[in-house]
From Swiss-Prot:
One of its GO terms (biological process) is negative regulation of UDP-N-acetylglucosamine biosynthetic process. It comes from Rattus norvegicus (Rat). Its EC number is 3.5.1.25. It comes from the Eukaryota. The active site is at residue 294. A divalent metal cation binds at residues 143, 211, 232. InterPro entries: Amidohydro-rel (IPR006680), GlcNAc_6-P_deAcase (IPR003764), Metal-dep_hydrolase_composite (IPR011059), Metal_Hydrolase (IPR032466). It catalyses: N-acetyl-D-glucosamine 6-phosphate + H2O = D-glucosamine 6-phosphate + acetate. Substrate binds at residues 154-155, 235-236, 243, 269-272, 328-330. This is N-acetylglucosamine-6-phosphate deacetylase.
Amino acid sequence: MRSGQSAALAPVLQFTNCRILRGGTLLREDLWVRGGRILDPEKLFFEERRVADEQRDCGGRILAPGFIDVQINGGFGVDFSRATEDVGSGVALVARRLLSHGVTSFCPTLVTSPPEVYHKVLPQIPVKSGGPHGAGVLGVHLEGPFISREKRGAHPEAYLRSFGANAFHDVLATYGPLDNVCIVTLAPELDRSHEVIQALTAKGIRVSLGHSVADLRAAEVAVQSGATFITHLFNAMLPFHHRDPGIVGLLTSDQLPPGHCIFYGMIADGIHTNPAALRIAHRAHPQGLVLVTDAVPALGLGNGRHTLGQQEVEVDGLIAYIAGTKTLSGSIAPMDVCIRHFLQATGCSVESALEAASLHPAQLLGLEKTKGSLDFGADADFVVLDDTLHVQATYISGELVWQAEEAGL
């Protein structure tokens, strides 16, 4: 934790000639950074009588909060669901490579696996701050195995599980210690799921609804029990029906707890979700939309066969399938590509597209005071973008950790 005295002695950086995303608006203001946090310049001027130690001209570019990916299964040949002796080195490689896509924090995601995989892998993925070594790890997202057989998607049926009489004991027996976990995706129609949702929520773990055949009422009860997220909306759930809209209906439900915002993940890779569906979701509930990549280990690699947990995945162009089938198996589009596609598909504002990849995931995880914004006091994790939203540079705690060759920052 940064002490106030050491932070006060740290050099002050002033980013000039830029448009900063703050409060839902792109403002022509300078960004001030000291000790790894966003600084209020008025306090610097009037209370400390100080000016910047260094100025950096951003050439009119956009400065936005660093992107946060809460669902990423691996990438660049690394599979987070593979139980190796050195899972940490694979996570570190992905963390480093994500910097070029503007991602400053992420949740490594494990797909449905046998218990021995969770017991071996989870202790090797601790929460970790970001820096020059790579993006920070906010906690693990466990997607499965407590999901629907009918909507398992790319998850192997042999390892799916249900809850027994002592439901939360089953969770602990399956996963092992939950110290490194921040999100669990489950199907709310499973017996005793609400008992599990309450127990996980009591531990500060976010519960997401997904890979499910739940009707709207079951989904509403799950949210009333503590669930706050929907895993990749529209994918691996019942399609919207006018008499029972299923989980999708949560976006406009009037049965949620007062003041409760339901968040939902969207894979805006141009493959998983039709542009019309993106527009429907965004217009119905814009403040809950969270862009996710759902990237698989083939992210950053070429065509061919790769792994995802216990299964083989075949990449053909921009699409990843379970090998030998036409079942989609995650995405191979990085976060910056998803943001650009989302912007083009929905016609939303640049500000909305950027907040869907930064502020909203931070709010989902309860981290909005430190991540996902450029408010005074927040962590100085931010990305420098050109007008077409291509990443020019990435900063973590106010330190330049990646830049494009032509950026000159």
